[in-house]
Amino acid sequence: MHVSELQTLHISKLLELAEEHGIENANRFRKQDLVFAIVRQMMKKGEGFTCSGTLEILPDGFGFLRSADTSYLAGPDDIYVSPTQIRRFNLHTGDTIEGSVRVPKDNERYFALVRLDSINGDHPEVCRHKILFENLTPLFPTEQLKLERDLKSEENLTGRAIDLISPIGKGQRALLVAPPKIGKTVMLENIAHEVTANYPEVELIVLLIDERPEEVTEMSRSVRGEVVSSTFDEPAQRHVQVAEMVLEKAKRMVEHKKDVVILLDSITRLARAYNTVVPASGKILTGGVDANALHRPKRFFGAARNVEEGGSLTIIATALVETGSRMDDVIYEEFKGTGNMELHLDRRIAEKRLFPAININKSGTRREELLVPNDQLQRMWLLRKFLHPMDEIEATEFLNGKIKASKNNDDFFELMRGK
């Protein structure tokens, strides 16, 4: 049996299982403690268990397999990985491991990994010859992630508008700049749906930092990818740990030549968390940002790249503006030049209830000629020239109207030519 089968069960089902196996006071247990107790009882009765998880190596040299279901939070049902296994198989933090486990001995607190079956979906021997992420060659994105789908829904409107205004490629470092309450989380959700529908082979991770718990539940129920979160009631150290684990996991996948997309909401709150946990340097920038605080979030964002040797890491992150906080403005200014695609959402457009509320003139992609065929690129530039003299609201209203009136983007350009 697989440990994750128990971890994904609802708490009521786990309580029934606990009763079957004679575990007393089970309703007083936290979910992770309950899983630990059930697995222990079943293994004592001779049941064999396999496990999978993402490795986190601690400073002491040993590691634990953390579960994505608990957003990589340390718990009693984590699987211990010995330093010998880590050295033998050349393991790193972020490796996704599958193997067999044994029950803890009398003086032990955790289940231990006894046999390693696969690393990141490949045979363990393959991992000995992989190239480290830091040694891979970064390139501009050359393959477009098309978000257009054969639908007449609101989310397809978002995807088609992005394809026309600022196309996204595999390996894009994209910044979605938005004031609060104008639909940036909904836009991220729409992008997630479109990526999973059009590119099922792409590994999608949605990372929610400092978000509301109900939004986390909604996102995890509607998105087919992995949703990892740290809610606003958790400490800054937890936000940082979750972000680091997601980044390391994505890097390991790229080393295995996979295409990975991370949707981060939001990089502003992640930078605030780093600002809280980083040791004080004594140099404070405007708005209360420590001079050393933005290095690690920049390292996170800077990891997005298209890789010459195969694979890519795409990061689409939201940045908050117009919050009334000087710190948020400083964080945005620091990240402004680092991305190679920006999508600006406008409060004035959103107040007119025009969604997606994209400010067309401010949004765009660097080196878009590498992503889009030349004939389509010429049409996109003509569209921009046509919309540029208009007011932002008028331009968005015109674009949204024409998208709704056409079946797809090719039909949209034919409609434009006819006009």
Curated annotation (Swiss-Prot):
Top-rank lineage group of the source organism: Bacteria
Class of the enzyme per the UniProt entry, highest EC level: hydrolase
Alphabetical keyword list: ATP-binding, Helicase, Hydrolase, Nucleotide-binding, RNA-binding, Transcription, Transcription regulation, Transcription termination
Listed Pfam families: ATP-synt_ab, Rho_N, Rho_RNA_bind
Transmembrane segments: none
Domain Rho RNA-BD, first and last residues per copy: 48-123
Keyword ATP-binding: yes
GO cellular component terms, semicolon-separated: cytosol
UniProt keyword Nucleotide-binding present: yes
Record-listed ATP binding positions: 169-174, 181-186, 212
Gene Ontology biological-process entries: DNA-templated transcription termination
GO molecular function, one term: helicase activity
PANTHER family: TRANSCRIPTION TERMINATION FACTOR RHO
Family: Belongs to the Rho family.
Protein name, per record: Transcription termination factor Rho
Originating species: Neisseria gonorrhoeae
